From Swiss-Prot:
Residues 39-42, 163-167, 244-249 are annotated as: Interaction with substrate tRNA. The gene is miaA. Keywords: ATP-binding, Magnesium, Nucleotide-binding, Transferase, tRNA processing. ATP binds at residues 14-21. The lineage of its organism: Bacteria, Pseudomonadati, Pseudomonadota, Gammaproteobacteria, Aeromonadales. One of its GO terms (molecular function) is ATP binding. PANTHER family: TRNA DIMETHYLALLYLTRANSFERASE. Belongs to the IPP transferase family. The keyword Magnesium applies. Substrate binds at residues 16-21. This is tRNA dimethylallyltransferase. Disulfide bonds: none annotated. It comes from Aeromonas salmonicida (strain A449). One of its GO terms (biological process) is tRNA modification.
Length: 310
């Protein structure tokens, strides 16, 4: 099929605090678009303030798919995202509208665009086995095992990253092949004509300032109470992906008495800036993307003109 015969989709990517949501809502008021969130933190229920989840007013203007879809105790993989996003995209197109995918989780965008490698599904029995070994021997011993069987993954994955470390070992124990071997097998690409845009301020100091202001606004809006409710549930730990989200891990440490309030605030801002830096690193190497300056009045018209879907 010729690429011009494929259905249209728009990607609006960018670091945290870059103005993606405002532009996305404006696009929905201009084009027949429906928003799909591409954010590994917005998927969790009960995590609204620290994730800067769209407000009720914003959601009334432009509903978002794939937010508030799972409990923080559960995990959600890039494969889960691809399955859910493609289902939503196909549904949107079937209604004669355009999927507008908005967010900053670049791994999700990449997986959706290029297709995922054929990795085996999680195996609870093997996960439990690895957890038991880690409790008995320590994560460093498991990391040493990974280095022996898959030096490339071992060099990339830190011993203090139990989620990724256990996944790499799990893949090997299930399939007999290393994570490095399997990820070299390309999946199926996205059957859409994708128009890709990245929005960010060109002045890094401005982005840093916006991040600091946003974090302080979260603190003023009840972020501590939000995380305390999660903390007091009793079934959540700092090792879960939800609690490892930027801001939540730092507030969790504060509630556990491990750091003072001012240190928590400082660490939360630094962690958010580091996240933005990683997002920008991804985007600078992203092919076929049109860059937009945060806050520029002509961004809406530029997206409409470039996408050519009006």
């Amino acid at each position: 099929m010729n690429v011009t015969d494929l259905p249209n989709a728009i990607f609006l990517m960018g670091p945290t605090a870059s103005g993606k949501t405002d532009l996305a809502i404006a696009l929905c008021q201009t084009l027949p678009c429906d928003i799909i969130s591409v954010d590994s933190a917005l998927i969790y229920r009960g995590m609204d303030i620290g994730t800067a989840k769209p407000t009720a007013q914003e959601l009334a203007l432009a509903p978002h798919k794939l937010i508030d879809i799972i409990d923080p105790a559960l995990s959600y993989s890039a494969a889960d995202f691809c399955r859910d996003a493609l289902r939503e995209m196909n549904d949107i197109v079937a209604r004669g509208r355009i999927p507008l995918l908005v967010g900053g989780t670049m791994l999700y965008f990449k997986a959706l665009l290029e297709g995922l490698s054929p990795l085996p599904s999680a195996d609870p029995a093997i996960r439990a086995e690895l957890e038991e070994e880690a409790a008995r021997l320590g994560w460093q011993a498991l990391h040493d095992e990974l280095v022996r069987i898959d030096p490339v993954a071992g060099a990339r994955i830190h011993p203090n990253d139990p989620q990724r470390l256990s996944r790499a070992l799990e893949v090997y124990r299930i399939s007999g092949k290393t994570l490095t071997e399997l990820t070299q097998v390309q999946g199926e690409g996205l059957p859409y004509r994708v128009h890709q845009f990245a929005i960010a301020p060109s002045d890094r100091a401005l982005l840093h300032k916006r991040i600091e202001q946003r974090f302080d606004k979260m603190l003023q809006s009840g972020f501590e109470q939000e995380v305390r409710a999660l903390y007091e549930r009793g079934d959540l730990t700092p090792h879960l992906p939800a609690i490892r989200c930027v801001g939540y891990r730092q507030m969790w440490d504060y509630l556990a008495g491990e750091v003072e309030y001012d240190e928590m605030r400082y660490r939360g801002i630094v962690a958010t800036r580091q996240l933005a830096k990683r997002q920008m690193t991804w985007l600078r190497g992203w092919p076929e993307v049109t860059w937009l300056e945060s806050g520029e009045s002509g961004n809406l018209a530029r997206v409409v003109a470039r996408a050519g879907v009006a």
